[in-house]
Amino acid sequence: MEVIYEDNHIIAVDKTCREIVQGDKTGDKPLSEMLKAWLKEKYCKPGNVFVGVTHRLDRPVSGVVIFAKTSKALSRLNEMFRVGEVRKTYWAIVKNRPQQDEGELVDWLVRNEKQNKSYAYDTERPNAKRAILRYKLIAHSDNYYLLEIDLKTGRHHQIRCQLAKMGCPIKGDLKYGFDRSNKDGGISLHARSAEFIHPVSKENVRIVAPVPDDNLWKALSVDQ
């Protein structure tokens, strides 16, 4: 666990693809509990430590995750994420070049709970939620393409699903059509940055997570 930002109200970590944000059926220790122990030790606190979850990242995804250190920050950040006042930028490595190097994707997503998978459609249908993102090709190698994604809505598996529908499955994402897994078990989707107005100080905050320690990531991001 790597802490990449901290103030009196907020703490952010660079999540690896092996870590989970909140507890799940695996029983693995979540980042929220790791942070409580980290804060308790750092500040020598004898009692309980408050750490609130403000948003989530899928387990196989890496990058910025923001937690609240106070209840005031938690309630305000939860609302900011809900109404889209946190600008989230992702980087994704995909196997195919998009037909256009820059564009907007607008789809209707239907979530299948049993499969833990979402399906994208061109038109509205029952139980579908509108999903919007903008993407831009920012680098490429002989075999892979690095896309920067500005996420406008936060739907279940949205980026993974929409990029796959576009014909550009994310490297390592077997669930959405890539042909083989990554060695670390994750997928090549990275929450690169989060930018927002601080819920208490009202100053502009931008938190950036370094790319994963991987040769392909480093090669593609060297000029970014």
Question: Where would I find each of the regions flagged by the language model?
Answer:
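RNA pseudouridine synthases
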Residues: M1-Q224
